[in-house]
Amino acid sequence: MERHLITSAIPYINGIKHLGNLVGSQLPADLYARYLRARGHEVLFLCATDEHGTPAELAAAKAGKPVDEYCAEMHAIQSEIAKGFRLSFDHFGRSSSAQNHRLTQHFAGKLDEANLIDEVIEKQVYSHADGRFLPDRYIEGTCPNCAYDKARGDQCENCTKQLDPTDLIEPRSAISGSTDLEVRETKHLYLKQSVLKDQLDAWIDSKTDWPVLTTSIAKKWLHDGDGLRDRGITRDLDWGIPVKKGTQDWPGMEGKVFYVWFDAPIEYIACASEWAEANNLEQSDWERWWRTDKGADDVRYTQFMGKDNVPFHTLSFPATLLGSGEPWKMVDHLKSFNYLNYDGGQFSTSQGRGIFMDQALELLPADYWRWWLLSHAPENSDSEFTWENFQSSVNKDLADVLGNFVSRITKFCAAKFGSEVPAGGAYGSAELELLTKLDESLTRYQDYMGAMEVRKSAQELRAIWASGNEYLQTVAPWSVFKTDPETAAMQTRLGLNLALLFGVLSSPFVPDASEKILKCLGHPSARWPDTCTDFVTSMKPGDPFEVPEVLFAKLTDEDRATYSAKFSGTQS
């Protein structure tokens, strides 16, 4: 039995996430966690809400609530939605937890002891109307390069030119619109990442099995232009983790908090501590997952995230862990994803364009979405959601192949042999050929799943389902029954066992349908097969079963047209 630590990039607190967010981190992480558990491995699967930073403060203000109250409410909402999608986190934590406060302050103290922290006087824009320093992206104005009048203080979205806030013509606060701004001096802490450049470079080079997407982004940040730059890790905000050196105050840093991208990855560790506390476990129970001097040396740690999060996870967070000088578990494999687009464009919250996680669950069961998203995961390039493709995939894969097979074989057996597995008959060449083919498919499926090749795993699973339908079409037990009921009984018994096999193998992708199949076939606790050949004797003659309800209802053209119009972004 192996030990696997799995983390998904933690979703930001300010609102409900769209399907692109889901398929870029949490959903493939859940697929992998479910697969490893099914294979008998020990798994700790962690995620949390990312609750600090200016966007959280602004979202709370817009909602008319104190920021801590807003974050608590949104955490509860995101937690329920995650359950709706059957995301099997062992714990869904919060970056505002007491555990993350302690650990973040601890790491800052260790980095300072290692002489990896600089105190830097810098100039930032202060808004009198808002009573606060403004992060670069909360300053808008006219771009000096292209005259676009909504350029941000960090970059012009129109011409993509990198900017400083002082470059903008007629700058204004993006919060209040006020032009009553001034440049003030303020002191902040910087993590001296540049000192760790060679160490990080060698560490990344050692990860020969990482996706090209991951390593190319990391290398670009390491070597392009001026190379890896030191990074500010504090902000002038009210909401966040107060700046301390461990448990000690940090002179000159009063009233400041740690930057959200410094504390957010540390929440992966803090989340394990939260998990231990929530389950009345000891400190040693979470440390055995994270400290290589306390049992984590045999842990394989895998992270899942969208490509925009790769720089922080391949450089900044590893710099924190390495720089601390402590024996923390470093990531072994980082699975990154490209973007999912929506029907010819991007998802847009403000424009009501695209499907968000709560809306998806109101429309259709989680399995429909899980299957489409995973089978179209944006692994090697961006992918696109269209309602035509979604309808086709649900109907042709789930309804016509998996659902149809289970319905067909159980109904036939119930009609001809009753509601028990029939006895009689012996395998012929068709059965032996099928089982050889299935054993080969199972090996490929397991190889793809173990390698986190999400699309290939889905394709192989569908091929396994299809082999069942092809077998029934070839041997036609409904015709054989008329002249040779013994052989028809064997074919039907094998068909029922294939349905059970498909239910088990499908559990990481479509857990609700899998559970229904296993329950109706009388084997709710069926285990992952060693081989298909051995597994298909699980249901014995005389075992009772039930014909399940329709597993997957087809989507009509009318359904597709309704959904497409609803989420096009044209609604008021």
Swiss-Prot record:
It is found in: Cytoplasm. SUPFAM superfamilies: Anticodon-binding domain of a subclass of class I aminoacyl-tRNA synthetases (SSF47323), Methionyl-tRNA synthetase (MetRS), Zn-domain (SSF57770), Nucleotidylyl transferase (SSF52374). One of its GO terms (molecular function) is ATP binding. Binds 1 zinc ion per subunit. It comes from the Bacteria. ATP binds at T349. A motif ('HIGH' region) lies at residues 11-21. Zn(2+) binds at C143, C146, C156, C159. Keywords: Aminoacyl-tRNA synthetase, ATP-binding, Cytoplasm, Ligase, Metal-binding, Nucleotide-binding, Protein biosynthesis, Zinc. Its cofactor is Zn(2+). A motif ('KMSKS' region) lies at residues 346-350. It catalyses: tRNA(Met) + L-methionine + ATP = L-methionyl-tRNA(Met) + AMP + diphosphate. Monomer. Belongs to the class-I aminoacyl-tRNA synthetase family. MetG type 1 subfamily. This is Methionine--tRNA ligase. It comes from Roseobacter denitrificans (strain ATCC 33942 / OCh 114).
